[in-house]
Amino acid sequence: MNPVRKKRLYIVLAILCGVSIAVALALTALQENINLFYTPSQIANGEAPEGTRIRAGGLVEEGSVKRSPDTLEVDFVVTDGAHGVTIRYHGILPDLFREGQGIVALGRVNEDGVLVADEVLAKHDENYMPPEVMQALEKSGMMQKHNEAKAAKGYQQESAQ
């Protein structure tokens, strides 16, 4: 092999190694930042991986919010109509958080099947529903019940005025 071809071969190999390393680093960074969405039914069925950061969403079940009197810890149940999953959160909940509202929680499922959340996101207005939560609720038939309850609540408020 003549020296010019040998030099080109080394350059091509160096470029391939550099691109391979860059792709490997990018994939590793992306893999650590991916938060897959799971419904309460999927979590209850054991489909969500334990110890991996995930997103879970649904409606906060009425009467399920339990606050610790001496800490900021809050336990509540999120449901998609078919199953509910307990979410434990330590911190200040968003102002728009309330029972019957849609939320998305980011955290890890522990060995007891409880989602230990490090972030809770509430709907930013009463008409918005995160797309993943809406699909999960539509699939379980809970979305229609939620809309009927909202319509009845609006009717009650109008008749009270």
Curated annotation (Swiss-Prot):
Q: Does the keyword Secreted apply?
A: no
Instruction: Please state the span of the N-terminal signal peptide per the UniProt entry.
Output: none
**In terms of one coarse class, where is the protein primarily found?**
membrane
The keyword Cytoplasm appears for this protein: no
Q: How does it sit in the membrane?
A: Single-pass type II membrane protein
One of its GO biological process terms is: cytochrome complex assembly
Q: Which InterPro entries does this UniProt record tie to the protein?
A: CcmE, CcmE-like_sf, NA-bd_OB-fold
- One GO location term (cellular component): plasma membrane
Pfam families given for it?
CcmE
Name the SUPFAM superfamilies for this protein. Answer: Heme chaperone CcmE
Which residues hold heme?
A: H124, Y128
Query: What residue ranges lie in the Cytoplasmic compartment?
Result: 1-8
User: Where would you find this protein in the cell?
Assistant: Cell inner membrane
Please provide the record's keywords in A-Z order: Cell inner membrane, Cell membrane, Cytochrome c-type biogenesis, Heme, Iron, Membrane, Metal-binding, Signal-anchor, Transmembrane, Transmembrane helix
Transmembrane annotation, as ranges: 9-29
Which sequence ranges are listed under topological domain Periplasmic?
30-161
From the UniProt record, which GO molecular function terms apply? Answer: heme binding; metal ion binding
Q: Which family does it belong to?
A: Belongs to the CcmE/CycJ family.
Q: Which NCBIfam families match?
A: PRK13165.1 (NF009638), PRK13254.1-1 (NF009727), PRK13254.1-3 (NF009729), PRK13254.1-5 (NF009731)
PANTHER family xrefs: CYTOCHROME C-TYPE BIOGENESIS PROTEIN CCME HOMOLOG, MITOCHONDRIAL
> What is its biological role?
Heme chaperone required for the biogenesis of c-type cytochromes. Transiently binds heme delivered by CcmC and transfers the heme to apo-cytochromes in a process facilitated by CcmF and CcmH.
Q: Which named protein is this? A: Cytochrome c-type biogenesis protein CcmE
Q: Which organism is it from?
A: Ectopseudomonas mendocina (strain ymp) (Pseudomonas mendocina)
